[in-house]
């Protein structure tokens, strides 16, 4: 504001004062100071306000005194003087002297951008005050000039809301919205002043275009003043681009083209092509984005244009342009891919080595285009021709698995007749020239497609054609074996007797040596044929193994996987153990193949293979992949001796933190052997399976999970013995364990591992066990450890201290021990420890959590104290369980203490702050879960708590995660505890949901917005599904909620995703299709149906409001295509319940654009949304 550095000396007489004010050296802030002291002036100065106003008008009219226009003091004084003068006639006379329009335009132009950051726009208020006295007329050009300067300031506005307000004020001042007709002169003026600043703002805006209302407003201006049928916008566009080429950036050009795409109809594709060409010539790098935009908006251009563009790209030396544009061109028009397939295939072959991903993408698009055009059979003819002409270099197109997969997944589009004609044509070609491998590859592709998804009828129809493969003459191509094998994979009974008789010839000839290139297919053929008839496989096995041994490691692994997975039974029953062992050795070289094999449970039926596999894995126990594989093998398949050896090997060294080792041990111990070292020797078990306290704590610190929460190998072995405690071997082991831990805990400094073992054993002691005293010893020892820590505070004592507290908590909560005699001692110890922590200002989160668990059991009837303590520690799931346990124990004494805590929690919503909000919400949820049905006061307090949350919470003090937790809980309670929700509560939840939606969409990131939006919509959905009867006479509430939700989607279209719109569509559908209706009063069979009919009749009268809102938003805001598609089922559900009478009412209510949109919407519903019997 330009504060004075020293106070201005004000004259004490009117003459000098007026002279000071009139002085050209007097600055605006000095005039402001004088005016602010008018009330204190003792000098007689009549009409001083009129004098100063006249002076300001003179200064504003002076083109050399721009500092008056840019000073806030000027406009603040101006407004204040207008309010101070009580003579409207005098004001009008003065204001007529003001060159209002030029001053306004000049002020918008000069106003400092840094003042917009502080939302300081005092001049606008003054301008509106002037409008109260005078009618300010702007010419079209003057309006556009002022808006030009206003738009230039938008990017400096701190928020999008403020930017919209600033722009709207400028529009209101100029009355630009009153310009109803547009001609070439107005359009030229718009291009001169407003178009470039608008594009500049589009490029600078950081918010999503679809949710930025200023963006939408400026786009509307472009459509209104430029893109009108009576305007030669093509000429203006060309001139604008030429004149401003140096200033138009890539983003500006993109948004410029995007606006043309938005406002021009599908019939204007010729104009779009011209604009594309003009902008593309200036910004070639944007052509890809332009095409993407056309694809996303479902706007197209002519096939000729796309063809010319494709040919240009294919001839281009700019490889990046080719790679980026071609896929989009092919997506826009399938005919382009079909027509230019050979040029595209050459491109694929050329780029395959340099950019295989690009090549495969183009390949997919070519196939997709032919499939969509129902010309897949023609594609086979074209690829046959191309590969036959190009030779082996092109065979990857029909032989590489990825390329083949692209074809096979589209073969379902072929009809039975097409299948027959295609296969017959390929077989005729093979019969004519069996040396050409191309038709054989194509037949194999067809066979893969048949095996994947062809109908039984199709398979039966093509079977006679495929059977010709076995009878073809002059079939010398070595690929024949692969082809016959694949046919046998599709059909079980297709092999003719003559083919079966050939096997002796095949096995005895030198064919295995002469077809080395495809010998594996020949072996597969022989193995498959062996499943049809019995013959001696010895020679084939020898030749197969001889071939197998000469392969490199990778091919060995792949071949062994293929053979074992395809012919498991044959390999199991016919190969020797040495041969199977060799295959398994190679198979284990590839962990991916191994994992795939183990996913098929049938392999475990083959005993020889399973035996070899387990032995190989057991001998590789030091490798992680072997342990992970062993876990996948059913324990019944692993021999007991192998399990014993494995357990001993895995525990031969000190305990390892490797999770795979632990998981494997637990898997092996799921069927106990009672013979391994750790199962027969208690010392060995403790030494090899119990972590030292230091290791346990270090691991829990890394994984944020306590060791006791994990599966314990020690516990597994111990409980295995407990399950057969009367067996001699287990009885001896258990007695040994009891004696050892008793002896260790009787010492003042026992072995830490044995102490931990004693703590574990104490949890499993039954009341009638003669060693029950171990529990008392464990509790006493744990207390002694706590006391030792409180006295020494040595870091090495922390691990055992934490484990001791965890043990105490588990023993007490499971009812296995009495801690009452140690209560006061433990409380004193905790007080001592916490005082030490606070005095040293050291934070010990894990220790405090463990102390909280034990403390929660010792402070009886002090729920508020425990819950307050909970809010001051770091949260874990264990702490939640402790709170729940405390509440349940308290409720056994009655609900009074519980209700008092619930009341305090409810009233605390008004004072909650974000640091502890999430934990506070957890507290409220834990309590709410334990409100009993007969606790009427608890029901009331629950409603009060939700009301307090609705009234006082916002996103900044409450936090997004807290909201998510609360609404997830509400959603759960709506179903599990419906009696908690009164009529008042349900009606209050609706605005609570809307308030929360508004907070989330305006303050969170995109992912969080969508997650929160869906969550809250599901809450409303649950309210409707479970509590619909409470809305019997409240449909107007639900209509209002749905309308506001649709508005939120429209405003935040670019932020909210299709999943969010899907949730809204489900909500609307459930609203229109009631099915959860109580029928307790009448048991008649047709009563439920009549109730649903009555509800639908009531909804039908009210739901028109929702449909009207959707139509209005679709016209004014324009939902994106994805959002509109997702909302469609909900809109169709509304149409489902409307009668012709309601449709007529709606049509009469709508304006002309609304009627047109409604008609199109209804036609779409009848076409794709309305249920039909066919």
UniProtKB/Swiss-Prot annotation:
Keyword terms: Nucleus, Ribosome biogenesis, rRNA processing
CC annotations in GO: nucleolus; nucleus
Domain of life: Eukaryota
InterPro entries from the UniProt entry: Ribosome_Biogenesis_Reg, Urb2/Npa2_C
Entry's Gene Ontology BP terms: ribosomal large subunit biogenesis; ribosome biogenesis; rRNA metabolic process; rRNA processing
Localization terms from the record: Nucleus, Nucleolus
More info: Present with 1660 molecules/cell in log phase SD medium.
PANTHER family: UNHEALTHY RIBOSOME BIOGENESIS PROTEIN 2 HOMOLOG (PTHR15682:SF2)
Binding partners and assembly: Component of very early pre-60S ribosomal particles containing 27SA2 pre-rRNA. Interacts with URB1. Together with DBP6, NOP8, URB1 and RSA3, forms an RNA-independent complex, which is required during early maturation of nascent 60S ribosomal subunits.
Primary role: Required for 27S pre-rRNA processing. Has an early role during 60S ribosomal subunit assembly.
Name of this chain's protein: Nucleolar pre-ribosomal-associated protein 2
Biological source species: Saccharomyces cerevisiae (strain ATCC 204508 / S288c) (Baker's yeast)
């Amino acid at each position: 504001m330009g504060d004075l550095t020293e106070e201005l000396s004000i004259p004490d007489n009117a003459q000098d004062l007026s002279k000071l004010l009139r002085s050209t050296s007097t600055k605006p802030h000095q005039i402001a100071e004088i005016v602010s002291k008018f009330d204190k002036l003792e000098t007689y100065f009549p009409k001083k306000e009129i004098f100063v106003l006249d002076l300001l008008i003179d200064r504003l009219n002076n083109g050399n005194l721009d500092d008056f226009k840019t000073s806030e003091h000027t406009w603040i004084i101006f407004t204040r003087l207008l309010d101070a003068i009580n003579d409207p006639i005098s004001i009008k006379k003065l204001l007529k002297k003001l060159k209002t329009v030029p001053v306004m335009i000049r002020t918008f132009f000069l106003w400092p951008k840094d003042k917009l950051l502080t939302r300081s726009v005092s001049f606008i208020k003054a301008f509106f005050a002037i409008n109260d006295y005078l009618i300010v007329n702007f010419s079209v050009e003057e309006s556009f000039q002022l808006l030009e300067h206003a738009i230039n300031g938008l990017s400096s506005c701190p928020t999008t809301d403020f930017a919209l307000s600033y722009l709207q004020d400028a529009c209101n001042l100029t009355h630009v919205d009153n310009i109803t007709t547009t001609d070439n002169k107005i359009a030229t003026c718009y291009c001169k002043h407003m178009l470039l600043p608008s594009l500049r703002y589009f490029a600078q805006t950081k918010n999503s275009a679809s949710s930025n209302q200023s963006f939408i407003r400026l786009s509307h201006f472009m459509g209104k003043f430029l893109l009108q049928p009576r305007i030669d916008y093509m000429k203006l566009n060309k001139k604008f681009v030429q004149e401003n080429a140096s200033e138009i950036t890539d983003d500006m050009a993109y948004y410029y083209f995007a606006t043309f795409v938005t406002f021009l109809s599908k019939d204007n594709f010729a104009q779009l092509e011209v604009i594309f060409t003009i902008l593309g010539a200036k910004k070639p790098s944007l052509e890809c984005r332009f095409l993407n935009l056309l694809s996303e908006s479902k706007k197209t251009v002519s096939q000729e244009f796309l063809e010319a563009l494709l040919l240009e790209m294919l001839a281009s030396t700019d490889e990046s342009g080719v790679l980026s544009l071609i896929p989009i061109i092919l997506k826009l028009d399938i005919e382009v891919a079909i027509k230019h397939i050979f040029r595209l295939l050459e491109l694929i072959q050329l780029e395959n080595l340099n950019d295989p991903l690009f090549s495969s993408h183009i390949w997919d698009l070519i196939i997709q285009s032919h499939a969509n055009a129902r010309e897949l059979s023609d594609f086979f003819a074209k690829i046959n021709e191309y590969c036959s002409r190009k030779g082996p270099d092109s065979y990857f197109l029909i032989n590489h698995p990825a390329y083949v997969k692209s074809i096979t997944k589209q073969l379902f589009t072929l009809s039975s007749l097409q299948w027959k004609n295609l296969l017959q044509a390929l077989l005729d070609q093979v019969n004519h020239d069996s040396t050409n491998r191309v038709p054989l590859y194509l037949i194999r592709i067809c066979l893969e497609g048949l095996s994947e998804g062809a109908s039984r009828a199709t398979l039966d129809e093509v079977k006679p054609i495929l059977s010709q493969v076995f009878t073809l003459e002059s079939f010398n191509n070595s690929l024949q074996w692969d082809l016959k094998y694949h046919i046998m994979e599709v059909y079980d009974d297709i092999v003719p007797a003559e083919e079966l008789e050939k096997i002796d010839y095949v096995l005895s000839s030198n064919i295995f040596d002469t077809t080395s290139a495809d010998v594996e297919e020949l072996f597969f053929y022989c193995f498959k044929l062996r499943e049809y008839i019995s013959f001696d496989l010895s020679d084939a096995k020898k030749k197969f193994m001889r071939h197998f041994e000469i392969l490199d490691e990778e091919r060995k692994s792949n071949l062994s996987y293929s053979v074992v997975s395809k012919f498991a039974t044959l390999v199991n029953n016919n190969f020797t153990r040495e041969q199977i062992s060799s295959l398994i050795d190679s198979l284990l070289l590839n962990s991916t193949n191994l994992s795939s094999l183990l996913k098929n449970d049938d392999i475990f039926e083959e005993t020889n293979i399973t035996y070899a596999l387990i032995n190989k894995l057991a001998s590789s126990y030091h490798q992680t992949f072997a342990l992970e594989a062993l876990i996948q093998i059913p324990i019944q398949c692993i021999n007991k001796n192998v399990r014993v050896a494995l357990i001993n090997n895995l525990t031969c060294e000190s305990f390892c933190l490797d999770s795979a080792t632990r998981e494997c041990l637990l898997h092996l111990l799921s069927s106990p052997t009672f013979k391994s070292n750790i199962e027969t020797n208690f010392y060995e078990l403790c030494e090899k399976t119990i972590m030292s306290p230091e290791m346990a704590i270090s691991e829990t610190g890394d994984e944020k999970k306590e060791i006791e929460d994990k599966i314990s190998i020690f516990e597994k072995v111990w409980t295995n013995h407990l399950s057969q405690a009367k067996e001699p071997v287990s009885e001896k082991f258990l007695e040994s364990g009891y004696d050892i831990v008793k002896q260790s805990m009787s010492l003042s400094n026992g072995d830490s591992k044995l102490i931990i073992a004693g703590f574990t054993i104490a949890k499993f002691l039954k009341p009638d066990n003669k060693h029950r005293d171990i529990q008392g010893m464990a509790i006493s020892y744990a207390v002694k450890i706590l006391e030792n820590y409180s006295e020494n505070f040595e870091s090495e004592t922390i691990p055992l201290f934490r484990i001791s507290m965890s043990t105490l908590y588990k023993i007490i909560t499971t009812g296995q021990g009495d801690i009452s005699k140690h209560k006061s001692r433990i409380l004193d110890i905790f007080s001592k420890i916490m005082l030490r922590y606070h005095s040293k200002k050291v934070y010990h989160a894990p220790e405090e959590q463990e102390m909280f668990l034990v403390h929660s059991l010792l402070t009886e009837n002090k729920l508020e104290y425990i819950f307050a303590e909970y809010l001051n520690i770091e949260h874990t799931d264990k702490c939640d369980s402790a709170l729940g346990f405390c509440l349940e124990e308290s409720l056994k004494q009655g609900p009074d203490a519980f209700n008092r805590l619930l009341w305090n929690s409810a009233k605390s919503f008004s004072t909650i702050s974000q640091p502890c909000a999430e934990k506070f919400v957890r507290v409220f949820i834990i309590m709410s879960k334990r409100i009993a049905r007969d606790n009427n006061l608890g029901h009331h307090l629950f409603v009060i708590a939700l009301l307090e949350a609705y009234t006082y919470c916002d996103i900044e003090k409450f936090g997004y995660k807290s909201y998510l937790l609360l609404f997830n809980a509400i959603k759960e309670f709506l179903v599990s505890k419906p009696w908690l929700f009164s009529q008042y509560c349900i009606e209050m939840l609706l605005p609570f949901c809307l308030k929360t939606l508004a907070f989330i969409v305006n303050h969170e990131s995109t992912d969080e917005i969508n997650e929160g939006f869906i969550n809250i919509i599901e809450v409303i959905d649950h309210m409707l599904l479970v509590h619909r009867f409470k809305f019997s006479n409240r449909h107007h509430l639900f209509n209002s909620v749905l309308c506001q939700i649709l508005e939120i989607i429209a405003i935040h279209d670019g932020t909210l995703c299709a999943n969010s719109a899907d949730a809204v569509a489900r909500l609307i559908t459930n609203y229109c299709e009631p099915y959860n209706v109580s029928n307790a009063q009448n048991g008649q069979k047709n009563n439920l149906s009549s109730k649903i009919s009555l509800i639908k009749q009531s909804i039908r009268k009210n739901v028109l409001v929702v449909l009207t809102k959707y139509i209005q938003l679709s016209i004014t805001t324009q939902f994106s295509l994805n959002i509109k598609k997702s909302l469609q089922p909900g809109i169709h559900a509304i149409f489902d319940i409307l009668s012709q009478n309601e449709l007529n009412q709606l049509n009469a209510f709508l304006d002309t654009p609304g009627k047109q949109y409604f008609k199109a919407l209804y036609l779409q519903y009848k076409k794709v949304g309305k249920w039909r019997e066919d």
